[in-house]
Amino acid sequence: MSSASIQSNKTSNIHNESIDKQMEAKAHETAQNTDLKNEARSLFDNATKSIGRLAGNDESLNLNLKDMFSEVFKPHTKNEADEIFIAGTAKTTPAICDISEEWGKPWLFSRVFIAFTVTFIALWVMAAVFNNTNAIPGLIFIGALTVPLSGLFFFYESNAFKNISIFEVIIMFFIGGVFSLLSTMVLYRFVVFSDQFERFGSLTFFDAFLVGLVEETGKALIIVYFVNKLKTNKILNGLLIGASIGAGFAVFESAGYILNFALGENVPLLDIVFTRAWTAIGGHLVWSAIVGAAIVIAKEQRGFEFKDIFDKRFLIFFLSAVGLHGIWDTSLTILGSDTLKIFILIVVVWILVFILMGAGLKQVNLLQKEFKDQQNKIQE
C-alpha cells in the first residue's frame, strides 16, 4: 500500500471519529434537554396538582389551549350567539345531568372584542382625523371597556352550568363594579401609606402590597354579597361572579387613569389606552375571579360567613390574588423590564384561573354523581 493511501485512510478514520464524537455530543445534549423538559413538566404537574387539590381536584392541569380556542377562528351563526346570550334563565338552564364536564370552547368573547375594537377605531378616526373632541369621552370609555368586558364574556361562556343570565352579569358588572370601588375608597381611609408615597407619589414595596390587600378586600366584600345572593356553591359560578365585579372595577378605574394621565401627565392618550388595555387581561378581571372561586370553595353549601376568611383554602387563593396584585404595583422589574414582569404575572394568574376552572369541571362530575345517587334513593 502506498504512503498516500495510508495517509488517506488515516485522514478518513480521523474524520469518522470526529463525526462519531459530534453525534455522541449531540445525542447527549438532546438527552439532557429531554430530561430538563421532563423535569419541568413533572414540576408543573406537581405544582398544579397541589394547588388544584385545595379546590377539590387531585389532577394536574392538562389543558390544550389550541383546542380550547379552536372555535374562535371558525364562522358562527347569529343563532349560535343567541343561544349563548339566552343562557341562565329558568327555561334555558340545563339540568345537572345534561352539563358537560369537558373543557368548553368559548368563541363569542372574540366577537365582542372585535365589535368594541371597531367602535374604538371609529371613535379614534372622529377624534384624530376630523378633530372632533366630542369623541374623546367615548374613546376613553370604550378603550377602558374593550378588554375587561371581552374577558368577562370568556368567563360567561366558560360557565358550564349556564345558570347565570347575561342580565345578572350586567348587574354585577355595573353595580358590583361601582360598589367595589366605593368599598375600596372606604377601606383606604383606614390605612396609612409611607412618607415616600405621601411626598412623591411613588409606592414602596409595603405600599404596593397594601394597595393589593385593600383593593382585593374591597372587591371581595361585594363578591361575597353576590355569591350569597345567588346561593351558589359552584366554583365556575364563583369565577364568573368575581370576574364580573373585577371587570367593572377595572373599567371604571382605567377610564379614570386614562383621563388623568392624558390631561395631567402630558402622555399621549392612545399610549395610555393601549397600556391599560393589554395589561387588563391579567389584572382586576382575573384577580377577582380567583377571589370569587375562593369564596365559593370556602363557604361550601352554606352562605359565606366571617369565620370562612380563616379557611386555609380561602386564605391561599385570596392571598395569591393580593400577592400578584402587589407585585404588579411594585417598581420591581425582571431583567430590567417592567413589561416582562407584567407578562410573567399574566401567565401565572391565568394558570391559577385554569386550575380553578379544572376544579370547577371536576365539580360537575361530583354533582352529577350526587344527583344520580339521590335519584336512585328515590326510586328505591
What role is predicted for each listed range?
Residues 2-380:
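Hydrophobic alpha-helical segments at protein termini of multi-pass membrane proteins
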